[in-house]
Amino acid sequence: MTNLAYHLPTFIPAWRIVTEKRDRDGDFALPASLMRRMVCVKLQTIMWKQEFLMATMLDVSLRAGVSKATVSRVLNGTGQVKESTRQQVFTAMEELGYRPNFLARSLANQTSNSIGLVVSTFDGFYFGRLLQQASRQTETHGKQLIVTDGHDAPEQEEQAVQMLADRKCDAIVLYTRYMSEKTIMKLINSVQTPLVIINREVSQAADRCVFFEQQDAAFKAVDYLISQGHREIACMTVPIHTPTGKARLMGYRKALEKHGIRLDERRIKYGDAGMTRGYELCRELIAEKVPFTALFACNDDMALGASKALHQAGLKIPQDISLFGFDDAPSAKWLEPALSSVYLPIDNMIVTAIDQAIRLAKNQPVEAIPPFTGTLVLRDSVTTGPYFNQKSSSASSS
């Protein structure tokens, strides 16, 4: 009987279609359009077979000896279920080959049991670390992570957020480099899905933001160089039209200002965060004969490019030029000499953001999260400068 039920639907629909399509001479006509219809029927039949043979939640409950409601609680992670009962349910699921239909459940509940993540780009170690930790943290909450990128364009970042909202993500985490604060607030207020912003401070949505003190971290790096006797300090920026780029440059300026060092605009080179640009900008500094004893690169990739330019010019690190990076990339400790840099706790930031997003999704109360701070990682690329034995306040600015 089971075999008959399995095979019967394969033939009956096709027979009906063919008998309805006899030509005038009584012969069967099978034009291309009909063949397409028969293929569709065949596909529908295969789906029917799978559904006919697929184990259901009721089957699991009968095999485990528990109610269907208990199986549902185990699958959804809701309610109180004894561990022994949970194991019974999981054993029954494995024996029956049961797979929950998450798509059907999401349509019924208007959720997807997933967290969306929008990043500016997939390039670089920074985003690799962020994605890895985001995936792990999402899994600890029993949810899936859906990731998309904004192609370094605010319009596409906005579209990505809307796409994830349309997919009924429980919450969305947005890492944006370029989106304006006005657009961020528009999304927070218009998108029904809870939205958490990382690496950006939005004053009107303090409980939705998880960010670094970028300016303070850059200030610490340049302040350290000054404390080591450097006053002629050059700076290579990351894109200045981004909040991160502006904040790191401001940290550089504030450190000089604190020590009464006059800002020399010739020592500031505006970059794009890449190794090639770091190499080119450092060559410009050398070619223009701008005097400097230390170089602050606003990310480690640019510092790496600068190190090659210095080497080609016959300048030694740190004997001739001290070099300080930012982000503490994995490559920093493998440079020769090892690169001093600023470490930002990316892992802690994304874990906090995921947790905050899930609290919002559950309509739990949330509070503003204090900003994360950077830590100086001191290695071998910095040595004392010409003013090391003098007080900063008494040294003449260059």
Predicted regions and their residues:
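N-terminal helix-turn-helix DNA-binding module of bacterial transcription factors
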Residues: 5, 9-11, 16, 20-21, ...
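Flexible loop/turn connectors
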Residues: 13, 283-398
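N-terminal helix-turn-helix/winged-helix DNA-binding helices
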Residues: 52-56, 94-132, 140-141, 151-152, ...
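Short, solvent-exposed amphipathic alpha-helices that sit
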Residues: 88, 126-140, 217-221, 243-262, ...
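Central regulatory/effector-binding core of bacterial HTH transcription factors
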Residues: 136-181
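Flexible loop/hinge segments that line or gate small-molecule binding clefts
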Residues: 152, 174-220, 261, 301, ...
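Hydrophobic alpha-helical segments within soluble ligand-binding/sensing domains
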Residues: 210-235, 250, 254, 275-284, ...
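An alpha-beta-alpha
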Residues: 219-261, 266, 369-382
